[in-house]
């Protein structure tokens, strides 16, 4: 079966967008609310009709992720950010560990269902502070025990703040969700060695169409 770089690139852009948000929260203490919301909302899309449907069917919802893919895969306009590279490699590794752990996957699904049930209490706003705190707790309880912790670099003033810690963990959880999607559509780590150009070309095409 032919490798589906269309869907692989969408899913990888989801991972890259999530880890770019992590970096922004850690270094700047903030990130674009709409971009953050696009990543967080993907956590509640459990039965999508297509890969893009996870991100509400809009490539524009992955703009930051597509920019990051281009920079990471060697676009002449982008410079390699090794910090971001370390984050997405670790997120993909953790998502692969999750995929091989049926108990953890079941626990994650159960906790996300709880989030959905709680939404009406917060006027269906997944971005409510308590919702972000609950998503962060899922990352700590379900994902962190799967493997070595992702060491996030940034300004200490931000990293010690509980609200920033929660946004970082919620972003990482969105990255894990995209990492699971990446595996489901045929993503493998070998592709980053042998098919970087194909992923880059696809990301460039997507970006031009936004």
Curated annotation (Swiss-Prot):
Q: What is the membrane topology here?
A: Peripheral membrane protein
Q: Which domain of life is it from?
A: Bacteria
- Localisation: Cytoplasm; Cell inner membrane
Q: Per its UniProt record, what InterPro entries does this chain match?
A: HflD (IPR007451), HflD-like_sf (IPR035932)
Family, per entry: Belongs to the HflD family.
PANTHER family according to UniProt: HIGH FREQUENCY LYSOGENIZATION PROTEIN HFLD (PTHR38100:SF1)
Kindly provide the name given to this protein in its UniProt entry: High frequency lysogenization protein HflD homolog
Query: To which species is this protein native?
Result: Actinobacillus pleuropneumoniae serotype 5b (strain L20)
Identify the taxonomic lineage of the organism of origin.
Answer: Bacteria, Pseudomonadati, Pseudomonadota, Gammaproteobacteria, Pasteurellales
Query: What gene name is given for the protein in this entry?
Result: hflD
């Amino acid at each position: 079966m032919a490798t589906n770089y269309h869907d692989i690139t969408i899913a990888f852009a989801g991972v890259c967008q999530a880890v770019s948000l992590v970096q922004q929260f850690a270094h700047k203490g903030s990130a674009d609310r709409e971009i953050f919301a696009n990543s967080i909302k993907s956590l509640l899309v459990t039965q999508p009709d297509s890969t893009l449907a996870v991100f509400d069917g809009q490539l524009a919802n992955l703009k930051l992720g597509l920019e990051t893919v281009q920079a990471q895969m060697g676009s002449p306009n982008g410079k390699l950010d090794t910090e971001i590279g370390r984050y997405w490699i670790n997120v993909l590794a953790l998502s692969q560990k999750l995929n091989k752990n049926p108990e953890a996957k079941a626990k994650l699904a159960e906790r996300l269902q709880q989030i959905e049930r709680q939404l009406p209490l917060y006027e269906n706003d997944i971005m409510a502070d308590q919702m972000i705190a609950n998503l962060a707790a899922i990352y700590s309880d379900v994902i962190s025990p799967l493997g070595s912790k992702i060491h996030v670099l940034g300004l200490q003033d931000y990293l010690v703040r509980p609200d920033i810690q929660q946004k970082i963990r919620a972003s990482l959880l969105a990255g894990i969700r995209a990492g699971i999607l990446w595996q489901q559509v045929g993503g493998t780590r070998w592709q980053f060695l042998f098919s970087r150009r194909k992923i880059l070309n696809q990301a460039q095409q997507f970006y031009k169409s936004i």
